[in-house]
């Protein structure tokens, strides 16, 4: 076997391999012997068919199969010999084959980039320092009550916390536009569902009033014909409702799994859940900064084959979220996912290099802790932990999570980390 390697462009490589004619003939004869032992041909007993008959009937197909097998095996031998690390599937380019002559073919592929981590000491990370206060728990209890609230008619004017039922008709330059009209439209105020100025125009009005509000569509509005346009909406305010919050009764509290039904028990449970969320939010905030710094400090080439593969993964995930199938996933435009796919590949390569250079292995105690932390959010944590422990795929996934955490910690060990006091609400809003 003769091998030559050339760089085509960037991470592209082309390996040219020549297989000696005698190697091909030896492999063909060996395979024909195997075929002769198995085939049945009229007039001959199984395993007793003369070789010339076997060669005449099966020689061409056997030779084709042998060439394909030799191409694959010799390529593997070549990349091992040349210490090449291919990224993605190779593209075989067969040469012309002539019986009795050496056979030359080429294989084109990309290689993984050589990554040398730099600039870790220049990475700056701001770690939030947060405590869950009694006031934070009060706010969360109010949120829980609002989620369970009922609505009752309100005689007064609408404000930011109310719900309204309206008819509206929108127009631009005196002309109604498509999608600008609705009847009995129920709008929960304060959620930012409508364009800027729409809700503000309703505030202060009472049920039964008819009025017109002036708004301007944002420049980034999805409808091209409405971007930046001034519009008028004729409003018929049919109903104004206000929330009626439930009291913290024993019955209400027990809905949240607090068996004794006490306010103190609910506060304890809410605080515990908030602290678990807080721990994850701090971890994610620090991790995202460390990874962002790592990416900025290390500009690397990325094999297009890996990006293609990641795009396919993202397509399938998107299709699954919306109930689509494999065919629909492939029809989703590549450009929707390309930037995210490239980012994920870059992060994977850089963290992989951290893991390699630091010789990291998943810490089983950390894996156990991650599973227990995740399971604590479920009604029966022990059942969840047991389910994970019996599922190899889930355990491997959790080991990968632990290993990634360890890699991020290795980056943080060299980065400039400062602490900043932050409120629970501020941090959680940053995560949203």
From Swiss-Prot:
Species annotation: Citrobacter koseri (strain ATCC BAA-895 / CDC 4225-83 / SGSC4696)
EC number: 5.2.1.8
GO BP, sorted A to Z: 'de novo' cotranslational protein folding; cell division; chaperone-mediated protein folding; protein transport; protein unfolding
Subcellular location: Cytoplasm
Entry's Gene Ontology molecular function annotations: peptidyl-prolyl cis-trans isomerase activity; protein folding chaperone; ribosome binding
SUPFAM superfamilies with a match to the protein in the record: FKBP-like, Triger factor/SurA peptide-binding domain-like, Trigger factor ribosome-binding domain
Keywords of this entry: Cell cycle, Cell division, Chaperone, Cytoplasm, Isomerase, Rotamase
Annotated PPIase FKBP-type domain residues: 161-246
Gene3D superfamilies: 3.10.50.40, Trigger factor ribosome-binding domain (3.30.70.1050), Trigger factor, C-terminal domain (1.10.3120.10)
Domain statement: Consists of 3 domains; the N-terminus binds the ribosome, the middle domain has PPIase activity, while the C-terminus has intrinsic chaperone activity on its own.
Protein's job: Involved in protein export. Acts as a chaperone by maintaining the newly synthesized protein in an open conformation. Functions as a peptidyl-prolyl cis-trans isomerase.
Catalytic activity: [protein]-peptidylproline (omega=180) = [protein]-peptidylproline (omega=0)
GO cellular component: cytoplasm
Protein name: Trigger factor
Spans traversing the lipid bilayer: none
Annotated family: Belongs to the FKBP-type PPIase family. Tig subfamily.
């Amino acid at each position: 076997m003769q091998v030559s390697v050339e760089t085509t462009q960037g991470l592209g490589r082309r390996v040219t391999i020549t297989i000696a004619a005698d190697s091909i003939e030896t492999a063909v004869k060996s395979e024909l012997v195997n075929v002769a032992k198995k085939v049945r041909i009229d007039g001959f007993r199984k395993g007793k068919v003369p070789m010339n008959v076997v060669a005449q009937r099966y020689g061409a197909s056997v030779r084709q199969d042998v060439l394909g097998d030799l191409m694959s095996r010799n390529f593997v031998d070549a990349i091992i010999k040349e210490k090449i690390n291919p990224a993605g599937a190779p593209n075989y380019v067969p040469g012309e084959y002539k019986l009795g002559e050496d056979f030359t073919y080429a294989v084109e592929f990309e290689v993984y980039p050589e990554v040398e981590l730099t600039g870790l000491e220049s990475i700056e990370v701001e770690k939030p320092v947060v405590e869950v206060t009694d006031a934070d728990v009060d706010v969360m209890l109010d949120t829980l009550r609002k989620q369970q609230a009922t609505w009752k008619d309100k005689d007064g004017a609408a404000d930011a916390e109310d719900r309204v039922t309206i008819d509206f008709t929108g127009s631009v330059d005196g002309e109604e536009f498509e999608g600008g009209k609705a009847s009995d439209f129920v709008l929960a105020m304060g959620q930012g569902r409508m364009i800027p100025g729409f809700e503000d125009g309703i505030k202060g009005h009472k049920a039964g009033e008819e009025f017109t509000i002036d708004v301007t569509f944002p420049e980034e509005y999805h409808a091209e014909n409405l971007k930046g346009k001034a519009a008028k909406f004729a409003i018929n305010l049919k109903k104004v409702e206000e929330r009626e919050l439930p009291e913290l009764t024993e019955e209400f509290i027990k809905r949240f799994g607090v068996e004794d039904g006490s306010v103190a028990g609910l506060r304890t449970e809410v605080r515990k859940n908030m602290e678990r969320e807080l721990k994850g939010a701090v971890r994610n905030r620090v991790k995202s900064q460390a990874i962002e710094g790592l990416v900025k400090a290390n500009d690397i080439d990325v094999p297009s084959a890996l990006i293609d593969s990641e795009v396919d993964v993202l397509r399938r995930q998107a299709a699954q979220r919306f109930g689509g199938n494999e065919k629909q996933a492939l029809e989703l435009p590549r450009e929707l996912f390309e930037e995210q796919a490239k980012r994920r590949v870059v992060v994977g390569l850089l963290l992989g290099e951290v893991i390699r250079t630091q010789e990291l292995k998943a810490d089983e105690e950390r894996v156990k802790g991650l599973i227990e932390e995740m399971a604590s959010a479920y009604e029966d944590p022990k059942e969840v932990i047991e389910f994970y422990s019996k599922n190899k795929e889930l355990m491997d996934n959790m080991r990968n999570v632990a290993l990634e955490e360890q890699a991020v910690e290795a980056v943080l060990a060299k980065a400039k980390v400062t602490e900043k006091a932050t409120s629970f609400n501020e941090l959680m809003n940053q995560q949203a």
